[in-house]
Amino acid sequence: MLIQNNFPKDFMDLAQNIVTKKANIFRFVCSTGDKLVATNTNETLVQYGNYKEGFYSPKESAVLQKLYIENEFKDSYKKDDKEPFESCVLYQKNVFFYKINDSIRNKIKIAELYTSKDPAREFMQGVFFDKEGKIVATDGRIMYVTNGIPEFPVCQIKVTKILLKILDIADYIEMGIKYANSKNKETNQEVRVAKYIIFNFKIGTSEFTYSCKLIEGKFPNWKAVIPEKQDFHVVPFDKKIWKDIYSASKKLQPRYDKNLYFTIEDSNHVTISNDDIVYATIEWSIEPDINKRNVLVFNADYLNILLTKSGELIDIGYTNFLRAFTFTYKDGSIAVAMPTQIKE
């Protein structure tokens, strides 16, 4: 039997990004009486308040009889003798929180663009907080490095769909690390390790908590990727021209071919093309590389992130058209990107 209920819209909208599509208990939102909980066991959203106990669909805002749900699912999902939804709620004793300002929010959103989307590369799927206060993200081809929170603990967080929404709409956000004891495989000793990232946030006067498991595994040695120096530096070309070229390339090139060729015609002109398609000859003062190559090839999708989505670009540095380029932004952030390798 379904009974219609009115529940907080912000919570239910966010919950749709967490609940599973599988036929298990975690496709529902649970009201324990004093809080609403949505979870898939890896990430959990909580809003405290007084709500009628039961299991609810975040899409239909409907309640199902609790006994029906309990009989079918409850015992299968018990953990440490706790109800399945209670066991996913992280309590915040000894968690120190750091306020997230608009600048850090924006940097986390930019960093997410640089993360790997390959399921086999989980160690590159997150945004890394370095011990020196840097925020770093890479997929192996492009990397973003920016100043973060100097005192924040070392960890790697997964920037999920719901976290992106929270970063966009929350009026206040703070985040902290939840630690847990874990056995060291080499020494067999109990050690304290970071396990979860917790975000407390407000939308208007409503208060929420979102938590997610941290990504485990060693993040790549990002410092080794940054070139010590670049022999050539150029200012970026007009962003509006780039947007027109990028839009045209999306329409005219096959999906499997993302490359754009930049051919230096003379000291002030570059032709941008792909095979038989010539998109434009633009004014851009860029010199051939140290080996006198005059053709540079870049993945258009990567270049679009570098040119239009990472902040105000003020400098592009390079030495060799087959090696890493550096992109420097007005706020001090940098990006490192590998051009596409071409046969000479």
Language model segments and positions:
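Structural preference for solvent-exposed beta-strand-turn elements
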Residues: M1-E344
